[in-house]
Amino acid sequence: MSVKFMESVGYECDLQTMAMTGTTRHIYFGGKVPMIDVFIDKLDYCHEVNYDGRLELDPWSVSLADILLQKLQIWEINHKDLVDIEYLFTVADFGEDDAKKVNVGYVARRFADDWGFWYTGTTNLDRVKEHVGGVDALNDDQKAKIKQVADEVRARIDQEPKTKKWEKRSKKGAKKIWYNTGFSDW
């Protein structure tokens, strides 16, 4: 997506963000949608979510597995992001491929190679299970389904064989920072 195109349809590029992340992220303001956040090839916040070879999986969006990874990678996760995960858990199908479902195998393989991402992601699955109990808008069946899906996703993650890199990093645990702290949010 080019800056010229976005400007031609009424958006202004946030130059500060572009100066800091020029090749990976652009933020545009204006137009009918007040803000558009564009990630190029990867999202690199607390943990990297790489879209290389994955943008072709869905004609309208990043894959559902990548959407889940985008949320699970946030160490200081907030209410809105937990609700996004809970919504995904109530409406999406889960399986071992990307055909209109969350590819849990892909998520598990991604976590199996990165202890830090695994730790953040599995911690956030626990946070979802805790958070959903306080969401008054959900009925008991919906809450139970969300908890069940969180448990099933976690079980699949746990089942995936871990790499030597994961095993080596796991020995240090949370005593050493395991997530990126040098990212900038708008």
Spans of features found by a protein language model:
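The feature captures the alpha-helical scaffold/lid subdomain characteristic of nucleotidyltransferase
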Residues: 34, 43-60, 64-186
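Conserved catalytic core of two-metal-ion nucleotidyltransferases
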Residues: 3-46
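Short amphipathic alpha-helical segments and helix-helix/interface helices
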Residues: 2-3, 154
